[in-house]
Amino acid sequence: MFERSSGILFHPTSLPGKYGIGTLGKEAYAFIDFLKKSKQKLWQIFPLGPTGYGDSPYQSFSSFAGNPYLIDFDLLIEAHLLSEEDLRDIFFGDNEEYIDYGAIYNQKYPLLRKAYENFKSSDNNEMKDSLENFKRENSSWLNDYSLYISLKNHFNRLPWNEWAHDIKNRENSAMQHYKNELADDIEYHNFIQFLFFKQWNDVKRYANENGIKIIGDIPIFVAADSSDAWANPEIFLFDEERKPVKVAGVPPDYFSATGQLWGNPLYNWEKLKETNYSWWVERVRANLSTCDIIRIDHFRGFEAYWAVPYGDETAVNGQWEPGPGIDLFNAIRSQLGELPIIAEDLGLMTQGVIDLREATGFPGMKILGFAFDSGEENDYLPHTYTKNCVVYTGTHDNDTLVGWFQKAKEEDRQFARDYLNSRADDEIHWDAIRGAWSSVACMAISPVQDFLGLGSEARINTPGVASGNWQWRLKQGVLTNELAERIAKLTKIYSR
């Protein structure tokens, strides 16, 4: 179902700009122009949801809401919601290449609150009508999300399972009480979501008009502290106190003797099946309205997932439990039609996972950055690919190509040189990109860092390291016409 194509992986928070973090303003449109000049058809991003502690897009307060950090202030000035004076002398961080999330948190929300107060006192009836329409169309998730965020602030940012018992359990009287008490806060968060989706939908429309599709991302699990978990406790494995019975993780392996303890709540798949997986159907539906294609993270968890007893400090005592399998995807497909989905099928693969991916028809993933272990044959080398896969030079979880090459064992470096017919180490990233683009994979994608030949300083995430992630930003002016022409030439040669 996917045409031969290529694209760039680049999350909007990493866009350059003057407000400390990438936004959905003019730099987003300039990046789409760069994609078009480069003859790219795909822009891949991370999940767009609101981020919390650790700033990871993969641990969001909602599977449906948008990240307020991405709202562009210049567009709010154009809409007469803020003035240039409001933004004068505000500290958004002092390094244009790294996001200072503390500064963003401290400055962004007061400015968005000011925009909301200006909106309330304005006579912009057209925008007020648009907000009411937005609330109606998105009520299935928005009502719970805006109440959840308002409650979270009310309870000093505590996770929902530490709130007062009556509202933690969503008792009717408590729900009504807090909806009344926090009414203005709730409307403020409705307004923020309205702004986000207005700006995002305009960006997406511009991309589509220029022949570019956006690939979004769905983490399989939701965050423990999320409106999803608070508002839908029946679809998770919680006890009577709304504490998880078991949580998600990954078993011990060659890289980790204790495995990985992710801590996300696990789904009650039996309960979900009773509703024909309606929550998952709505989640996919929402993501396919904000993006054109979606990558589903940890696809193997739909075949079987590692369930760890709640309270354990490592993942050692977990066990495999069966996922919903093809039944889930049949239910989604029967309600939404053909599914433009990429299956993230990395990690521990079994025949059962391979069979499930083949039954869905979804393309899996190949990571070229994993291919050059000289000690063993592996299926990340391009000559092993089939058409129904997506090749990445790297993802958010691994080092840049140049960073990998600088740290790799010499025999692995030499294997990469030999395999890619590389004549100069300072061109290794281009030789790897050529290897991906020339392959039979239906889609080829490279992080923007690899096109620029950046090293480990531009790595956006190091799994298992708690701080310093998701901060990297692109410098202004590095996406040149010369770079676009070089990418375009490669793309034309290999009919992408």
Predicted regions mapped to residue ranges:
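Asp/Glu-centered strand-loop micro-motifs enriched in Gly/Pro and often flanked by an aromatic residue
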Residues: 1-4, 9-37, 192
